[in-house]
Amino acid sequence: FKSRYFEDYNIGDIIKHSVPRSITDGDVAIYLSTTGSRFALNYSKEFSKKIGYEKQPVDDILLFHMVFGRTVPDLSLNAIANLGYAGVKFVKPVYIGDTVSSKSKIVGVKQNSNGKTGTVYVESTGRNQHGDVVLTYYRWLMMRKRKEGIIDSFEDKIPDLPKFVNHRDFFIPENLKLFSEVFSRMHKLEWQYNSINVYV
């Protein structure tokens, strides 16, 4: 497999990453046993159903790694370092049996002063088998140059990355029962949206 160097990335390029990945019971079992995750939503089918999910969703971090993993052959083979992430949004739940695919758009490029590397900024999107967006995020990587030296004609473009994820972008199922019998001993939460108090 021939990976790209810094010079091969251009603003606006779309990379459709190969080999979509179906999520299996085994993936989830290994993830839960390896990480020790005990989030009830991802750990208990009964809990998930009681609060309004159709079934037990896959842990968000496992989903992230599944989507991220599709991008590695196209983005990471000539990368020296993974420099950061921004604007990570889990848009829709994913379930065992779903198949996720990934696509990335080049949104920024910048030469580094050492002349040996550059920084590539990408926006990656994960979709399920129905074409629904399930995850979006930005990341930036330090990438090797094919040929060392500063390219005089090169124009840096550093994107304006999101500094936070707006709470309005969080996924909340329409039929979510936050205060069913499962939460009978908990206090009600009060969220402040601008000047309106919303009780959930």
Question: What do the PLM-derived regions correspond to, one by one?
Answer:
Residues F1-G84, R146-V200:
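Hot-dog-fold acyl-thioester-processing enzymes
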